From Swiss-Prot:
Urotensin is found in the teleost caudal neurosecretory system. It has a suggested role in osmoregulation and as a corticotropin-releasing factor. The non-hormonal portion of this precursor may be a urotensin binding protein, urophysin. Disulfide bonds join C77-C82. GO terms for molecular function: hormone activity. Keywords: Cleavage on pair of basic residues, Disulfide bond, Hormone, Secreted. It comes from Platichthys flesus (European flounder). Its main location: secreted. This is Urotensin-2. One of its GO terms (biological process) is blood vessel diameter maintenance. Belongs to the urotensin-2 family. It is found in: Secreted. It holds the Pfam family Urotensin_II.
Length: 83
């Protein structure tokens, strides 16, 4: 049986190393999934705001929505348009 144990030992060894490697890759992917997507989400929101601003330049109705988003309660005026 010590022969089978010695024969079995090398196989679990590399397998455990592979599992550790995969685990480290999973940890990296998890950390990437946790942190950069939040930054990406922030960038997405920023691009959404920029797109809304561009649409507000083209569409007066979206200007009204942008005003209510930005100045919710203080003033409802944006450039020459007041609500």
């Amino acid at each position: 049986h010590p022969i089978t144990e010695s024969a079995e030992m090398p196989y679990p060894g590399p397998a455990s190393l592979e599992e550790r490697g995969v685990g480290s890759l999973d940890d990296l992917s998890l950390s990437e999934q946790n942190y950069p997507p939040q930054r990406g989400a922030g960038l997405r929101y920023a691009t959404l705001e920029v797109l809304l601003e561009k649409q507000s330049l083209l569409n007066p109705f979206s200007r009204v929505f942008g005003i209510r988003k930005q100045f919710a309660g203080t003033t409802e005026c944006f450039w020459k348009y007041c609500v």
